[in-house]
Design a protein with these regions (language model features):
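Bacterial Sec-dependent N-terminal signal peptides
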Residues: 1-10
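Acidic, low-complexity intrinsically disordered segments
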Residues: 6, 28-153
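Hydrophobic alpha-helical targeting segments used for export or membrane insertion
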Residues: 9-13, 17
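C-terminal segment of classical bacterial N-terminal signal peptides
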Residues: 17-26
Length: 153
């Protein structure tokens, strides 16, 4: 009988530790996490807004993970390089995570602000936007907020 109680106590303790570990692991997963990645443009191309992006330029891509759904977003970045722009508006290519959203990006000094708006919630993980620079760039996310119109009704 004592042996059975010890086994039950050991199983209960192991279950409790496993449950706590699960809570810690899930707490580490940030929702609406914005990540930055870099790649080199292989061939010169013309962006949708008419900006010529030369071969060898750096493509800076923002992507989202654990997307909870949003119809509007504001992302503020710090950038150590000037981004390719037309009339002060950063030349950017929308990714699949923005869906049919209207996206605008502008740079003022080291600050880059990207704003989006859509009638529908986007719940897709993946690329938000890609923009370009001809010099070495380091871009960090200062702040990112995502709002859903459906949540505010």
């Amino acid at each position: 009988m004592k042996q059975t109680k010890k086994i039950i106590a050991a199983l209960a303790a192991a279950t409790m530790v496993a449950s706590c570990a699960g809570v810690v692991a899930s707490a580490d997963e940030a929702v609406n996490a914005v990540n930055v990645s870099y790649s080199t443009v292989a061939e010169t191309f013309t962006a949708a807004d008419g900006t010529v992006v030369p071969a060898g330029a750096t493509a800076v891509t923002l992507s989202i993970e654990n997307n909870t759904g949003f119809s509007a977003s504001d992302i503020t970045l710090n950038a150590t390089a000037d981004l390719l722009a037309v009339d002060g508006m950063v030349a950017a290519t929308n990714g699949s995570a923005y869906g049919d959203a209207i996206v605008s990006a502008a740079q003022n000094g080291s600050k880059v602000v990207i704003t989006s708006a859509s009638l529908d919630d986007s719940k897709a993980d993946g690329t938000l936007v890609t923009f370009y620079t001809t010099s070495a760039a380091e871009v960090t996310v200062e702040d990112a907020s995502f709002e859903s119109v459906k949540n505010n009704e």
